[in-house]
Amino acid sequence: MGTILDKIVDQKKKEVAALYETYTPVKEKRKTRSLVKALEQFTVIAEVKRASPSKGDINLHVDVRKQVKTYEECGAGAVSVLTDGQFFKGSFYDLQTAREESSIPLLCKDFIIDKIQIDRAYEAGADIILLIVAALTKEKLKELYSYVLEKGLEAIVEVHDEQELEIAIQLNPHVIGINNRNLKTFEVDLSQTEKLGKRLNEEKLLWISESGIHSKEDIIRVKRAGAKGVLVGEALMTSSSIHTFFEDCKVNI
């Protein structure tokens, strides 16, 4: 029986095949916004996340324009948009809507396995592409990372364990994302940030913490580990006061 990640990647293969049948990439170049620059100070990458395999529906009918505008007003350094439809109920339309509303860097959060998905994200307005080590062979990861650079975009290369981290370090990527969620089981363990963060601090690489960040205490914990930013979805999508969450992120260590 396959893992959740296996099921997602199988679905992505079908979507990629459909894209090759129905989508022609645009040739025009455009200006992009830099996450690396935003991470010069501690940054919240605030996510638009309608649903997930682990939580089910989170905020299914969110007004993307309103949510993104609130994030930017509260001081988000970047916005992440889930574009997966089958498991997270997002879309490239959500990404495009966020681009129309936002002037800060925009991350396409999806399970990218092929260049044509990067083309589609670029057209929808993405500045940053998520590349998940667990979903790719070493060769495919290298190929897609090179293509991200070719498009003038930045990448977050996502890892969960030591083995994936060593693969990511070889790329010397713009940003490494430590995902506290195991994509095979979808269980969350914030100590992954502390374990892997030590190695990244030694390498002097730029990195962020992803998943399982819900409170001021969590923010303090990942800041102490050396993270330059956090990617937060569920906590913001269910928050009664997004402003308060952002205020908590300003705590000094």
Swiss-Prot record:
So what family is this one in?
Belongs to the TrpC family.
Show the taxonomic lineage.
Bacteria, Bacillati, Bacillota, Bacilli, Bacillales
For this protein, the Enzyme Commission number is 4.1.1.48
Query: What keywords are annotated for this sequence in UniProt?
Result: Amino-acid biosynthesis, Aromatic amino acid biosynthesis, Decarboxylase, Lyase, Tryptophan biosynthesis
Provide the protein name.
Indole-3-glycerol phosphate synthase
The family database entries (InterPro entries) matched by this protein are listed as: Aldolase_TIM (IPR013785), Indole-3-glycerol_P_synth (IPR045186), Indole-3-glycerol_P_synth_dom (IPR013798), Indole-3-GlycerolPSynthase_CS (IPR001468), RibuloseP-bd_barrel (IPR011060)
What's the superkingdom here? Bacteria
> Can you cite a GO biological process for this protein?
L-tryptophan biosynthetic process
SUPFAM superfamilies reported in the protein's UniProt record: Ribulose-phoshate binding barrel (SSF51366)
Catalytic activity as recorded in UniProt:
1-(2-carboxyphenylamino)-1-deoxy-D-ribulose 5-phosphate + H(+) = (1S,2R)-1-C-(indol-3-yl)glycerol 3-phosphate + CO2 + H2O
Pathway recorded for this protein: Amino-acid biosynthesis; L-tryptophan biosynthesis; L-tryptophan from chorismate: step 4/5
Q: Is Ubl conjugation among the key words of this record?
A: no
Gene name, please?
trpC
Ligase recorded as keyword: no
Tell me the GO molecular function terms.
indole-3-glycerol-phosphate synthase activity; phosphoribosylanthranilate isomerase activity
| Organism this protein belongs to | Bacillus thuringiensis subsp. konkukian (strain 97-27)
